[in-house]
């Protein structure tokens, strides 16, 4: 049996996936089944755009269900070990870009729960890779997408 990719995530991220799966199974799936039923009542399925759209939607929902079930089955819950001296998945890191004093904070999470707009970056991102394993007051070079880099100083880990 081949090794399954594990999906590191916080307990919060795991619970969010479970909620999303529950909604897909108990709300979205029955809704699309009803849409298909209604579209079938229109008759000829060969030229029935409502039926085609509902079947497409059903396919997307089933695909999402399979993807989330796979992630839940292969989830690796990251427990907080209480060590706020080292950056790791689940921790929120505050740093300043050098030179300067403006602070930025991000929580490092598994790719399944990453959301930059909510300040959650994937452990697979270049920034997180550069920060993981580093400690308080460490200066770190973070690679940028344009090929450059920025220097940051870690000022808080929680």
From Swiss-Prot:
Any GO molecular function: DNA binding
GO terms for biological process, alphabetical: DNA-templated transcription elongation; regulation of DNA-templated transcription elongation
InterPro entries: GreA/GreB_C_sf, TF_GreA/GreB_CS, Tscrpt_elong_fac_GreA, Tscrpt_elong_fac_GreA/B, Tscrpt_elong_fac_GreA/B_C, Tscrpt_elong_fac_GreA/B_fam, Tscrpt_elong_fac_GreA/B_N, Tscrpt_elong_fac_GreA/B_N_sf
UniProt keyword Magnesium present: no
Keyword Transcription in record: yes
Parts forming coiled coils: 2-70
Keywords noted in UniProt: Coiled coil, DNA-binding, Transcription, Transcription regulation
Record family assignment: Belongs to the GreA/GreB family.
PANTHER family assigned to the protein according to its UniProt record, in alphabetical order: TRANSCRIPTION ELONGATION FACTOR GREA
Function according to Swiss-Prot or TrEMBL: Necessary for efficient RNA polymerase transcription elongation past template-encoded arresting sites. The arresting sites in DNA have the property of trapping a certain fraction of elongating RNA polymerases that pass through, resulting in locked ternary complexes. Cleavage of the nascent transcript by cleavage factors such as GreA or GreB allows the resumption of elongation from the new 3'terminus. GreA releases sequences of 2 to 3 nucleotides.
Name of the protein this chain belongs to: Transcription elongation factor GreA
Organism name: Staphylococcus epidermidis (strain ATCC 35984 / DSM 28319 / BCRC 17069 / CCUG 31568 / BM 3577 / RP62A)
Protein's gene: greA
């Amino acid at each position: 049996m081949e090794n399954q990719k594990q999906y590191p995530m916080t307990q919060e991220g795991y619970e969010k996936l479970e909620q999303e799966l529950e909604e897909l199974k108990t709300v979205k799936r029955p809704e699309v089944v009803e849409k298909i039923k209604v579209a079938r009542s229109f008759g000829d399925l060969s030229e029935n755009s409502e039926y085609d759209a509902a079947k497409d939607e059903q396919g997307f929902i089933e695909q999402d269900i399979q993807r989330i079930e796979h992630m839940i089955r292969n989830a690796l819950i990251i427990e907080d070990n209480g060590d706020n001296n080292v950056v790791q998945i689940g921790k929120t890191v505050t740093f300043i870009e050098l030179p300067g004093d403006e602070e930025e904070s991000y929580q490092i999470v598994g790719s399944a729960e990453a959301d930059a707009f909510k300040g959650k970056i994937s452990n697979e991102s270049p920034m997180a890779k550069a920060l993981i394993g580093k400690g308080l007051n460490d200066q770190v070079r973070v690679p940028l997408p344009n090929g450059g880099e920025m220097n940051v100083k870690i000022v808080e880990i929680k």
